[in-house]
């Protein structure tokens, strides 16, 4: 018996070594590469790249090789450096032919990030639905949590750990009335008081139909969002940006990236393909353009999108990154 245990132990160790050796080799031979900070400038019509050299000196240049000072970059990226330009009294009256103020810029600026580790992390299946039309200025966390079951939605009072039957029936009936099929297969919300307003959740039902769910004055608000013919959504993201222009984002089964407008209409973006389970996505948005950084396990791709119709303005590829698979 002891001999068998030793043999089993050594076999297990050997299997683990074979499994881990490729990763260990990749990790030990990894050469760290810092991706330069890259932003699209609608003022310049090109990407502005900021990078440290071997002597730790900053270089600022565009894709054509033209170099710039920090003060010039401030003016080329007024949405990013709005505070600096305002402090220096250099903020322009117009940008790209449009009259703007620092307040306009700050209202429409936003950042968004999606990483595979968050997408692939185990989900508890418990959510918090805030009151979206509170009489108070500040948002407040609810006293209950909810979950989706095969038959409906259940609200659980956290103090007593008991199901609120009346509220559960109220919300379940409304969801069924709007055509929702239980159970839900994906839900995205942002239950925090550190935001300007609450839009509840974007939810995919058992048939991958898209719904908007929130609580307004204690009652359910449910809206079925119409999808283009043949589109099967797989991931949704609630946004809740200050401008209130968008409700969220959606990625379909073919990895197409859609913008969900505040009225529920969908616009397909020019991004060529994004798999949230494998790729990292970062968006720096303003009222003129979006700088979208799509990172795979090896490469970085930058896309400049028009902030009006999300069409492609310019793209840039950085094929040089070496990192362990996330």
Language model feature labels by segment:
Residues 124-136, 180-191, 230-240, 272-289:
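Repeated scaffold domains used in trafficking and secretory/extracellular systems
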Residues 316-325:
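Residue-level detector of conserved catalytic or cofactor/ligand-binding positions
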Residues 167, 255, 259-264:
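C-terminal luminal/periplasmic domains and tails of membrane-associated envelope-modifying transferases
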Residues 6-25:
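Hydrophobic membrane-insertion alpha-helices, especially the h-region
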Residues 216-217, 263:
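Short loop/turn segments that connect beta-strands within beta-propeller blades
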Residues 164-175, 221-229, 267-274, 315:
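Beta-propeller fold detector
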Residues 24-48:
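Alpha-helical transmembrane signal-anchor/signal-peptide segments
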Residues 45-113, 132-156, 192-205, 211-212, ...:
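Short beta-strand elements that form the blades of beta-propeller/WD-repeat-like
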């Amino acid at each position: 018996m002891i001999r068998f245990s030793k043999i089993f132990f050594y076999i297990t160790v050997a299997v683990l070594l074979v499994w881990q050796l490729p990763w260990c080799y990749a990790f030990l031979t990894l050469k760290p590469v810092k991706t330069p900070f890259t932003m699209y400038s609608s003022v310049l019509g090109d990407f502005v790249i900021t990078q440290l050299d071997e002597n730790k000196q900053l270089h600022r240049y565009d894709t054509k090789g033209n170099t710039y000072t920090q003060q010039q970059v401030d003016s080329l990226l007024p949405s990013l450096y709005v505070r600096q330009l305002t402090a220096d009294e250099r903020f322009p009256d117009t940008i790209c032919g449009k009259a703007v103020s620092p307040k306009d810029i700050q209202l429409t600026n936003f950042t968004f990030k999606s990483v595979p580790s968050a997408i692939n992390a185990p989900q508890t299946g418990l959510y918090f639905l805030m009151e979206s039309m509170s009489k108070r200025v500040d948002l407040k966390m609810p006293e209950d949590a909810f979950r989706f079951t095969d038959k409906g939605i259940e609200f659980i009072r956290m103090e007593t750990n008991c199901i609120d039957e009346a509220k559960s029936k109220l919300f379940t009936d409304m969801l069924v009335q709007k055509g929702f099929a239980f159970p839900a297969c994906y839900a995205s919300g942002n239950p925090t008081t550190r935001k300007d307003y609450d839009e509840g959740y974007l939810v995919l039902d058992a048939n991958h139909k898209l719904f908007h769910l929130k609580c307004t004055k204690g009652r359910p608000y449910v809206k079925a969002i119409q999808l283009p013919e043949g589109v099967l959504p797989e991931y949704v993201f609630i946004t809740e940006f200050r401008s209130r222009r968008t409700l969220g984002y959606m990625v379909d089964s073919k990895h197409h990236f859609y913008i969900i407008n505040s009225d529920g209409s969908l616009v397909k973006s020019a991004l060529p393909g994004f798999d949230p389970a494998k790729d990292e996505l970062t968006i720096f948005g303003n009222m003129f353009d979006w700088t979208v950084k799509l990172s795979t396990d090896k490469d970085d791709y930058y896309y400049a999108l028009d902030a009006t119709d999300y069409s492609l303005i310019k793209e840039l590829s950085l094929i040089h990154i070496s990192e362990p698979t996330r």
